[in-house]
Amino acid sequence: MSTNQDNFKKIISHAKEYGFIFQSSEIYDGLSAVYDYAQNGVELKNNLKKYWWASMVQMNDNIVGLDSSILMHPTTWKASGHVDAFNDPLIDNKDSKLRYRADVLIEDYIAKIQSKINKEIDKAKKRFGDAFDENEFRKTNARVLDNQKKIDNTISVMKKCFDDDDLVSLKKLIDDLGIVDPVSGSKNWTDIKQFNLMFSTSIGASSESSSEIYLRPETAQGIFVNFLNVQKSSRKKIPFGIAQIGKAFRNEIIARQFIFRMREFEQMEMQFFVKPGTQSKWYESWKENRMKWHKALGLGDENYRFHDHDKLAHYADAASDIEFNFPFGFKELEGIHSRTDFDLTQHEEYSGKKLRYFDPEINESYVPYVVETSIGLDRMFLAVLASSFKEEELKDNNTRIVLKIPGFLSPYKLAILPLVKKDGLSEYAKKIYDDLKIHFNIAYDEKDAVGRRYSRQDAIGTPVCLTVDHDS
């Protein structure tokens, strides 16, 4: 087992033991890829929401909030393209019986080759020191050139497969690259099939009168159908944005890696409406803005990178992910997408209602273009948890876990600890606690030796402990 895999298992175990995350319905053996946020987890999650909302809505005069419903008219999802195009290309390994997304298998293959390039560059940097010219090295080193050619060719073929909706050629690419099952090492693959990810349910008083609707697979459509209502009632001029935090649901067949990929999850999204022709400028602006926001959290600049999309969603003309270095490698944390006017135009067509903005500066009406920023809140939670998880060695050769969560995100900002329960210390400590708890979230603990109480607070990420002793 690798160090990262071992560490990830410890993080998952710690999350349960210290009240951050529980398996949903655990007494009934749980429900796969569905989790509950426990007493400390819900506080951390709420702090992440508050921080994002303050920075996105409170600090921006041209962004307002919305809380749209989970259930929407079913035609919404026909218009958005989800009914016909919200699919994952899935492939099974005949030997391990495990199922994978075909595009992810290929992307992981590309990442391994990129890792080889990075190692060559790192070795050269150490060898040549300050005289090293990375650009020249990339242009002249035979191994780097060969590996880069493999990456470029693979991306080109994969893109053509998706553009042509050619699953046969996509399967051939996996075979030609010699991609193996990450678990079994087998190359014995089935054909690739598309699988729609939406959950359906019914609405109505009886089976005869009910109609099929969907649990929303994303929160964005609730913003788009309310675009004109929000714009007119808030009297906002373009460019302006609408932000939302809410639950979404996807019938993920391949739901692994703890809370990274779940069937019920939460998104923090902002749709920014702009004048057609200016979307590229705003796309680059929001890319830069969002990366600055993430790095300001203090989780380590080296843990972030951009990954521009080669395969674009049906609504986008440009897309990039901010990836975070999770215990299982760099994976998507936030997506920034230039969605063009696809969504509003589609909803105009299917609803028969105009979704246009009248621009008084040019005296014209037009369908705005949209730049989207979308964070998976649960992934954000995991990024904070994983980067804050530290295992410290003690003098007696034992270890203890400390969560070094940024103070403004920690479940409790302060813990009040009476040194002992007698001599009036508990009463005095409780008075301090009662006076302060109205201002921010505080923990109070008087059980066990004070050293153990310090360790408990370290384990849940409390930044400050106030010990009430006889000199207080």
State each model region's role.
Residues 1-472:
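NTP/phosphate- and nucleic-acid-binding module
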